[in-house]
C-alpha cells in the first residue's frame, strides 16, 4: 500500500472514496424540484457528497452521491413519491468508475509526454483493481495557469496535479501553495521559474513524471512520496 505522508489521507476524504449511495433521479422538471429532493435526503439523514444536473428542461435528470443515508430503500421511495419523478436508478459511483483523478496542466508538448507516462503506469495498476484516470489540458499564460491550478481543488476526486511546462512562477506559484494546503499532491517538471521550488516533487523527464505521479497515488504501488519530497530527479 502506498504511504504518502499528508497525501496518504486521501482514502478518508469524502470526495476521494466511493459514497454509500449513487442514484440518478429522472422525470419532469419544475421549480422547487431540487428543494424537494434535498428535503427527502435530509429526512433520511443523508449527507450530499456530490450532485450534478445531468439534464434539464422538459425533462430532468439529477445525479446524487450520498453518505449516511439511514434507509436507502426508503429514500428511493421518497424520491419516487415526488410528483414529477418517474424513474430512479442506482449506479456505480464516479469513484468506482473513474477513481482518483490526476490532472496534467501546461504546454501541449510536455502535457502529452506526461500523459503518456501516466496512462501507461495507470494501466498497470487499474488491471489490478485500482482506478486512476488522467485529465489533461494544454494551457499557457500566468493567469490562465493559476486559475487552472486553483480549480483542481474544486474537482471531485482530484488527488494530484502535474505542472508541465518550461517556465512557471508568480501567481502560479501562489496557486500551487494553496493547492498543497488542501492536501493535493503537486508534481512539477524541472523548469525555469519558482514553481519547482514549491512542488512536492520535481522530475526532469516528463514521461517519468507521469509514471511517478501515478505511483504516488496508487494503493497498489509501494512508493513513499514523503521520502523523496522536495528532491529533483
Which residue stretches match the model-derived regions?
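A conserved regulatory-domain signal marking ACT and ACT-like small-molecule sensing domains
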Residues: 1-107, 111, 121, 136-140
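Conserved mixed alpha/beta catalytic, RNA-binding, or beta-rich assembly cores of soluble enzyme
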Residues: 88-233
Amino acid at each position: 500500500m502506498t504511504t504518502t505522508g499528508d497525501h496518504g489521507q486521501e482514502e478518508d476524504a469524502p470526495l476521494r472514496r466511493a459514497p454509500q449511495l449513487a442514484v440518478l433521479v429522472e422525470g419532469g422538471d419544475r421549480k422547487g424540484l431540487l428543494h424537494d429532493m434535498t428535503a427527502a435526503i435530509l429526512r433520511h439523514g443523508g449527507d450530499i457528497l456530490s450532485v450534478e444536473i445531468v439534464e434539464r428542461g422538459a425533462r430532468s435528470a439529477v445525479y446524487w452521491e450520498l453518505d449516511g443515508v439511514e434507509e436507502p430503500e426508503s429514500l428511493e421511495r421518497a424520491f419516487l413519491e415526488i410528483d414529477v419523478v418517474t424513474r430512479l436508478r442506482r449506479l456505480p459511483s464516479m469513484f468506482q468508475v473513474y477513481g482518483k483523478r490526476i490532472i496534467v496542466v501546461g504546454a501541449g508538448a510536455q502535457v502529452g509526454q506526461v500523459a503518456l507516462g501516466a496512462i501507461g503506469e495507470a494501466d498497470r495498476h487499474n488491471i489490478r483493481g485500482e482506478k486512476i484516470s488522467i485529465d489533461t489540458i494544454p494551457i499557457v499564460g500566468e493567469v490562465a495557469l493559476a486559475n487552472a491550478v486553483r480549480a483542481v481543488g474544486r474537482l471531485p476526486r482530484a488527488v494530484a496535479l502535474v505542472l508541465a511546462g518550461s517556465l512557471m512562477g508568480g501567481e502560479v506559484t501562489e496557486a500551487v501553495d494553496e493547492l498543497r494546503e488542501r492536501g493535493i499532491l503537486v508534481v512539477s517538471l524541472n523548469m525555469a521559474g519558482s514553481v519547482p521550488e514549491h512542488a512536492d516533487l520535481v522530475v526532469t523527464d516528463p514521461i517519468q513524471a507521469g509514471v511517478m505521479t501515478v505511483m504516488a497515488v496508487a494503493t497498489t504501488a509501494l512508493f513513499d512520496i514523503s521520502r523523496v519530497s522536495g528532491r529533483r530527479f
